[in-house]
Amino acid sequence: MGATGSGPFENDDALDFLDEVHDLPRQDRAGKILGALDVVLRATDYVEAPVMCEAVAGAAAVGASVNPAASQGEPYLPEWLAAEPLPTGDEELVEKSRQVLRRAVRSHDNEWWELWEEAGLGADVTASCRRALAWLGDRDD
């Protein structure tokens, strides 16, 4: 049975991506997430939903590592993040995570957003991205 929900970890693409991250040696995990963030941030045209989904999951995983107490209770939060958080001293990783979460809720050239909006869940995914932004210390105001 697949996972499907508006939270950053509540879908199969996100969970599969984070499983791939977890399977890497700890020192390579941030690089894998940074790669997913960069794909979205460097995109000059339409971003497909699975690509955005991986980037959002990676950004939220960084946020959960920055502020584990605030992210507790988030549906499908990978258990390994509590025991093996991502490095939070990497300001580039944190800032790019913020940028991706902001980009995710913009409709321009963004299939991920379009699908949520068509399903009537745009407000829900906006709230989940804002929650993850708050974990990163950004209120997004």
Language-model segments: which ranges?
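Short terminal alpha-helical segments
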Residues: 1-47
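Amphipathic alpha-helical elements of HEAT/ARM-like alpha-solenoid repeat scaffolds that form extended
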Residues: 14-18, 55-62, 114, 118, ...
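Charge-rich, solvent-exposed alpha-helical interaction surfaces
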Residues: 20, 32, 36, 76, ...
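Residue-level signature of the C-terminal ends
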Residues: 24, 43, 65-68, 104, ...
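Alpha-helix boundary/N-cap detector
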Residues: 24, 28-31, 53, 88, ...
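Short, well-structured hydrophobic secondary-structure segments
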Residues: 35-67
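Amphipathic protein-protein interaction modules
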Residues: 57-114
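Low-complexity intrinsically disordered segments
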Residues: 93-141
